[in-house]
Structures are given as structure tokens and as C-alpha cells.
Amino acid sequence: MATMQCDVVSVKESIYSGQVTMLIAKGAGGELGILPGHAPLVTLLQPGPIRVQLENGTEEIVYVSGGVLEVQPHVVTVLADTAIRADNLDEAAILEARKNAEQLLANQKSDLDSAAALASLSEISGQLETIRKIKNRAL
């Protein structure tokens, strides 16, 4: 099966680097499936899971808070603001953060409070979607 080089990096660290058979991500225009030989592309990423299918058939899932996806025919690069391996996400902490963001939104005192709460809720939704993907994979 054909492969391509995939690099997933955040501001802090390299999360994944290796050969993959496919990458699935949520871009500005919706979900993208990238295969080896894909046409060149650059798009903004939405908060949510990046699914990387490895040569051995297993799948790595990484949460990204946003960033840029660059595709070349045999190389795909994810430059993420924040990237966390899905296995390292803490569901209880994320649910608590969602509760706090919803309270901030309900008690907004300014447009800045509202914007911060909405941005936080967007990231939290992406994290919860990533956790759901992990749980579905285990079934």
C-alpha cells in the first residue's frame, strides 16, 4: 500500500512523524481525507481530531486546537497551535472546563467575555469529539 510522510507538530513538540496511509482532519471547509499523491493543498484546521492511519493498519488520534494543514503529493504536515495525543486527554477535566465556559457565557459582562467563552467551547467540543473517536475505536 502507498504511504506518505506525515509530521504532526505543535508549538511545543513533535507529536508524530512517520509513514502513513491516510490522514483525516477537519479543515476550514469540512472534513478532509488525504491519501498519498493528493494534490497540493493548504488549509486552516478546526479544533478536533486528526486521525492518522499507519502502515500496520492501526490508527493514531491526535487532538488539535487549530492550525494549518499542508499537503504535498508525498508529505503531509500539520502545524498545530496545540496538539495532544487523544489518549492523554482528561475527560473529567474537559467536562469541568465546559461547565465553566458555559457559566462564563451565561454571566457575560462584555463582548470579550463572550468571545473567550465561545472560543473555549469550540476547543472543548473538539476535545470531546476526539474522546468519542477514541471510545468508538475501542468498540
From Swiss-Prot:
Subcellular location(s) per record: Cell inner membrane
SUPFAM superfamilies: Epsilon subunit of F1F0-ATP synthase C-terminal domain (SSF46604), Epsilon subunit of F1F0-ATP synthase N-terminal domain (SSF51344)
GO cellular component, one term: plasma membrane
Pfam families: ATP-synt_DE_N (PF02823)
InterPro entries associated with the record: ATP_F1_dsu/esu_C_sf (IPR036794), ATP_synth_F1_dsu/esu (IPR001469), ATP_synth_F1_dsu/esu_N (IPR020546), ATPsynth_dsu/esu_N (IPR036771)
GO MF term set: ATP binding; proton-transporting ATP synthase activity, rotational mechanism
Membrane topology: Peripheral membrane protein
Keywords (A to Z) from UniProt: ATP synthesis, Cell inner membrane, Cell membrane, CF(1), Hydrogen ion transport, Ion transport, Membrane, Transport
Cited HAMAP family: ATP_synth_epsil_bac (MF_00530)
Stated role: Produces ATP from ADP in the presence of a proton gradient across the membrane.
Assigned protein family: Belongs to the ATPase epsilon chain family.
Protein name per the record: ATP synthase epsilon chain
Organism: Acinetobacter baylyi (strain ATCC 33305 / BD413 / ADP1)
